[in-house]
Design a protein with these regions (language model features):
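Conserved active-site alpha-helix within GNAT-family acetyltransferase domains
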Residues: 23-36, 116, 128, 140-157, ...
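Conserved acetyl-CoA-binding loop-helix of GNAT-fold acetyltransferases
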Residues: 105, 111-124, 148
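Acyl-donor-binding surface of acyltransferase catalytic domains
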Residues: 1-59
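Short, basic/aromatic recognition patches
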Residues: 60-67
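Conserved catalytic-core motifs of GNAT/GCN5-like acyltransferases
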Residues: 20, 36-47, 137, 152-171
């Protein structure tokens, strides 16, 4: 751990991310090695992709539009209201695992089901590949949504850096 902490400390913006079920232990080890907790609120979650909807979802609001694309093997989904992005996310496949990332709903569009919608749109794109499981890192708010969609927690995600500002790097 000491050598990883030293490498992390070499660059102020570098973050050491630890997947663990013993966050307290690594928080203490980090402190002993000059690192501070910059996030302890995320979890890693998985899902059996057989439980996910394989069809493109339908938007019930005519003012919203779904656009999907694929760039360099990464599938993107964006829901927009005119020129404004209401929700977005991406998924890429490694082996038989769909890795969901950067799922965001703009504050003005939250509590309208767009997070679920984006996840379903991305799952439909992931099914273009032979996928068995899904994987993601979830914020506190995301954990509620993903649990509702059948995802389960595997472990906690602890982020350590030399920054002592106490800001949660998992937000935003």
């Amino acid at each position: 751990f000491g050598s990883l902490a030293a490498k992390t400390a070499e660059v102020p913006s570098r973050v050491l991310t630890i997947l663990t079920n013993d966050a307290a232990r690594y928080s203490i080890l980090g402190q002993r090695n000059g690192l501070h907790v910059t996030s302890a609120t995320q979890t890693m979650m998985i899902v059996d992709m057989e439980t996910q909807d394989a069809e493109d979802p339908w938007l019930s609001d005519d003012d919203l539009k779904l656009e999907t694309s694929r760039t360099d093997g990464v599938h993107h989904a964006v829901v927009s209201a005119g020129e404004e992005v209401a929700a977005s996310g991406r998924v890429f496949v490694v082996g038989h695992t769909a890795i969901f990332d950067n799922i965001v709903t703009s504050p003005a569009y939250q509590r309208r089901g767009l997070g679920s919608f984006i996840m379903k749109a991305l799952a439909a794109q992931a099914f273009e590949h032979d996928v068995d499981s899904g994987l993601l890192l979830a914020s506190l708010d995301g954990q509620k949504l993903y649990s509702h969609l059948g995802w389960r927690m595997v472990c906690h995600v602890l982020m350590l850096s030399t920054s002592n500002e106490g800001s949660d790097l998992s937000v935003g």
